C-alpha cells in the first residue's frame, strides 16, 4: 500500500519554536523512514518567493506558493513539514482546502516569551521602528481557531510538543 502524504503546517509568532519543533519532528520521522521534506519560511523566502515583501497580499502569495509545493509533494506520499509564521487565518484555510491532507499545528507562546527568545533582534528592531509590518508588533497574527494540535512552548518541553504531533498523525492514520 502506498504511503499517504500529509502537510504538517506549523504556524505561530517569530520565536514561538516552529523551527525547533520542525527539526525535532523531522528527525523522528526520518528515523522511521518516512519520505519527508521541510519547507522553512526563511529558506522559502530566499529561494521560492524571493522578491515578495511583507504586505498582506505578498504574505498571502508567499503562503499560496508554499501551499502549491506542499500539494504536489503531499499527493506523492511525502510528509511535508512547513514552518512559517503564516499570520492570516483565511489564507491558511485556503491552503488547507487545496491540500486536503493537512494538519495544522499552532505553536503558541506569549509575545513576551517570543521577544525573550529573539536571537536575531527582530522584535527589538520592530519596536524601534526599523522593521515595518512585523507580525505581533504592528501587524496582526490570527491564531488558528481549531488547530489539530496546539503546542504551548512556554509550558511544555520539546519532546512533549513533538509527541503530541506524532500522536495526532497516528490518530489520523498517517503513521504506519
Curated annotation (Swiss-Prot):
Catalysed reactions, semicolon-separated: adenosine 5'-phosphosulfate + ATP = 3'-phosphoadenylyl sulfate + ADP + H(+)
Pfam families per the record? APS_kinase (PF01583)
Q: According to its UniProt record, in which pathway does this protein act?
A: Sulfur metabolism; hydrogen sulfide biosynthesis; sulfite from sulfate: step 2/3
Cited function: Catalyzes the synthesis of activated sulfate.
Keyword list, A-Z: ATP-binding, Kinase, Nucleotide-binding, Phosphoprotein, Transferase
Q: What class of enzyme is it?
A: transferase
Binding of ATP, residues = 12-19
Q: Which GO molecular function terms does the record list?
A: adenylylsulfate kinase activity; ATP binding; sulfate adenylyltransferase (ATP) activity
What protein name applies here?
Adenylyl-sulfate kinase
Which gene produces this protein? cysC
Record-linked HAMAP family: Adenylyl_sulf_kinase
> EC number(s)?
2.7.1.25
GO biological process terms, semicolon-separated:
hydrogen sulfide biosynthetic process; sulfate assimilation via adenylyl sulfate reduction; sulfate assimilation, phosphoadenylyl sulfate reduction by phosphoadenylyl-sulfate reductase (thioredoxin)
Location of the active site: 86 (phosphoserine intermediate)
Which organism's genome codes for this protein? Answer: Gloeothece citriformis (strain PCC 7424)
Q: Which SUPFAM superfamilies match?
A: P-loop containing nucleoside triphosphate hydrolases
Which family does the entry's similarity section mention?
A: Belongs to the APS kinase family.
Its GO CC terms are: cytoplasm
Under PANTHER family, the record lists:
SULFATE ADENYLYLTRANSFERASE (PTHR42700:SF1)
Coiled-coil regions, chain positions:
none
Amino acid at each position: 500500500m502506498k504511503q499517504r502524504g500529509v502537510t504538517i503546517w506549523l504556524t505561530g509568532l517569530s520565536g514561538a519554536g516552529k523551527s525547533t519543533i520542525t527539526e525535532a519532528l523531522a528527525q523522528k520521522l526520518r528515523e522511521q523512514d518516512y519520505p519527508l521534506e521541510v519547507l522553512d519560511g526563511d529558506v522559502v523566502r530566499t529561494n521560492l518567493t524571493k522578491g515578495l515583501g511583507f504586505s498582506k497580499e505578498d504574505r498571502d502569495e508567499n503562503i499560496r506558493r508554499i501551499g502549491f509545493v506542499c500539494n504536489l509533494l503531499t499527493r506523492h506520499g511525502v510528509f511535508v513539514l512547513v514552518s512559517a509564521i503564516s499570520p492570516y487565518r483565511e489564507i491558511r484555510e485556503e491552503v488547507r482546502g487545496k491540500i486536503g491532507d493537512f494538519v495544522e499545528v499552532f505553536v503558541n507562546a506569549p509575545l513576551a516569551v517570543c521577544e525573550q527568545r529573539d536571537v536575531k533582534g527582530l522584535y527589538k528592531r520592530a519596536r524601534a521602528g526599523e522593521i515595518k509590518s512585523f507580525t505581533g508588533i504592528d501587524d496582526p497574527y490570527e491564531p488558528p481557531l481549531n488547530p489539530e494540535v496546539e503546542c504551548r512552548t512556554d509550558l511544555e518541553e520539546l519532546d512533549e510538543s513533538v509527541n503530541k504531533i506524532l500522536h495526532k498523525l497516528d490518530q489520523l492514520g498517517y503513521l504506519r
